[in-house]
Amino acid sequence: MSPRVLILGLGHWGQTLAYLFEQRGCTVSSWGRSQGALSAALFQDIHLLVSALPIKAVREVAAQVTRLHPPLGIILVSATKGLESETFATAADIWQTYCPHHDLVVLSGPNLASEIQQGLPAAAVVGGNLAATKQVQDCLGSPTFRLYSNEDRRGVEMGGIFKNVIAIACGVNDGLGLGVNARSALITRGLVEMVRVGTHWGGQVETFYGLSGLGDLLATCTSALSRNYQVGWHLAQGKSLSQALALTKGTAEGVNTARVLCTYAQQHQLDIPITAMVNAVLCGSLTPQAALHCLLERPFKPEVIPGQ
């Protein structure tokens, strides 16, 4: 019998994951919030439960899932890249709270959905215990979608979360016509901020230099296909945040993530200047040009590479 997969979330990424599982011969069912409440029948005989929901919907849906008592053999796969505003919780944190006895893995990497749907090659990381990640690799991995495993679930998840903010910065850079040199500096120094916060959150340094960290950062910060990049680009063109979001198809998680990360960094005295400037632009307290000026006026300092 082919593996049965239930995907929660009917957005672009959820649809792309459904396509990938179907390509591997899995039997796939999909559910979206517009379809009403979940039912126990959806969980019958499934092997993988994949969450591709926006972060703001995860807690509500996870609460529904746990009330239906899904069988313990189901592996939960979190494919959400965001932080909950009130709690600093990641999507995996939320699923762990509501389904503590299920195996839980995180799927993340440089995966622009539209390229994958065209059949173009890509790679990603499954973070979690190796027995569970192996099952996901077997169900989802293919010659055009290469899956690696990593036991550092926290690091895999944090890389995918943080890169969205830096992608907004790079969209602003390109929208202002500031060139490749400046964008390269933003990506590199953004990686430093990712490692600084991600390791404080419990991730391992090495993970952030892999596919789910640096890899995702490069893809998202250099492609107009990225929703977060698009938001930054529209802001640089003089659009308001509401206008930028209206022009961007789908959820740009980096908008909320920037604010949450700034609050977290302030509480824990972590220096994340690029993220802070992105948040200031999103809040409307600085123009993109003024934010850039603030970054360039920072005192000179030694280049510190986390992990060295």
UniProtKB/Swiss-Prot annotation:
UniProt xrefs under SUPFAM superfamilies: 6-phosphogluconate dehydrogenase C-terminal domain-like, NAD(P)-binding Rossmann-fold domains
Keyword annotations: Cytoplasm, Lipid biosynthesis, Lipid metabolism, NAD, NADP, Nucleotide-binding, Oxidoreductase, Phospholipid biosynthesis, Phospholipid metabolism
Example of a GO cellular component annotation carried by this entry: cytosol
Tree of life domain: Bacteria
Biological process per Gene Ontology, one example term: glycerol-3-phosphate biosynthetic process
Localization of this protein: Cytoplasm
Active-site annotation: K163 (proton acceptor)
Main location: cytoplasm
Known catalytic reactions: sn-glycerol 3-phosphate + NAD(+) = dihydroxyacetone phosphate + NADH + H(+); sn-glycerol 3-phosphate + NADP(+) = dihydroxyacetone phosphate + NADPH + H(+)
Any single Pfam family the record assigns to this protein: NAD_Gly3P_dh_C
Pathway the protein acts in: Membrane lipid metabolism; glycerophospholipid metabolism
Iron as UniProt keyword: no
Binding site for NADPH: W13, R33, K81, A113, R227, E253
Gene Ontology terms for molecular function: glycerol-3-phosphate dehydrogenase [NAD(P)+] activity; NAD binding
Function description: Catalyzes the reduction of the glycolytic intermediate dihydroxyacetone phosphate (DHAP) to sn-glycerol 3-phosphate (G3P), the key precursor for phospholipid synthesis.
Protein name as catalogued: Glycerol-3-phosphate dehydrogenase [NAD(P)+]
Gene from which this protein is expressed: gpsA
